[in-house]
């Protein structure tokens, strides 16, 4: 596996990453059972992948939870990127319907706390906006909140 520095940091990141959306949902194929998902994550790591990309809404936190369970004792050996913005609390998603989005300060802080808890870590290497609309990108207050972390 080839590795590069992540931006201007000293973090070593694999050129290939593991996108963890599919281990939490079954929209376009066979459902992946949790034991199989954990084996997939471990196998990816054994093959040299140390970059795991997820999002809080993937299975309403399931993807993050699985990554946290597998790598809880190896946090310094992996790179985690997650994202937030969809408010899936108390909302039943029908098919591929759009969920409400929130990027305000209170929601951002709550989403971050919840992701850290599910991932069983005290920090993230990357934290992003999940599918923001143009009005969100133009809102400097969102980025001011993110910069405060």
Report each predicted region and the residues it spans:
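N-terminal binding-site loop/beta-alpha segment at the start of enzyme catalytic domains
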Residues: 1-79
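Feature marks short, surface-exposed loop/turn motifs that line or immediately flank catalytic pockets
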Residues: 22-25, 58, 86-90, 130-133
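Secondary-structure boundary/capping motif
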Residues: 42, 46, 84-87, 107, ...
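Low-complexity, flexible helical/coil segments
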Residues: 50-56, 87-91, 117-119
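Generic enzyme active-site microenvironment
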Residues: 51-54, 81, 123, 128
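Hydrophobic positions in alpha-helices of CheY-like receiver
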Residues: 71, 84, 146-149
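A short, structured active-site edge motif that brings together acidic residues
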Residues: 77-89, 127
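Glycine/proline-rich, positively charged
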Residues: 91-149
């Amino acid at each position: 596996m080839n590795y590069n520095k992540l931006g201007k940091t000293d973090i070593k990141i694999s050129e290939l990453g593991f996108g963890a959306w599919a281990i939490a949902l079954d929209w376009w194929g066979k459902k992946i059972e949790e034991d199989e998902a954990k084996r997939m994550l471990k196998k990816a790591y054994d093959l040299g992948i140390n970059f795991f990309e997820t999002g809080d809404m993937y299975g309403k936190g399931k993807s993050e939870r699985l990554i946290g369970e597998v790598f809880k004792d190896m946090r310094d050996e992996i790179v985690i990127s997650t994202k937030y913005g969809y408010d899936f609390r108390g909302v039943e998603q029908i098919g591929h319907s759009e969920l409400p989005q929130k990027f305000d300060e209170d929601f951002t802080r709550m989403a971050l706390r919840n992701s850290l808890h599910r991932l069983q870590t005290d920090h993230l290497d990357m934290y992003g906006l999940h599918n923001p609309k143009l009005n969100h990108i133009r809102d400097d207050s969102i980025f001011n909140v993110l910069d405060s972390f």
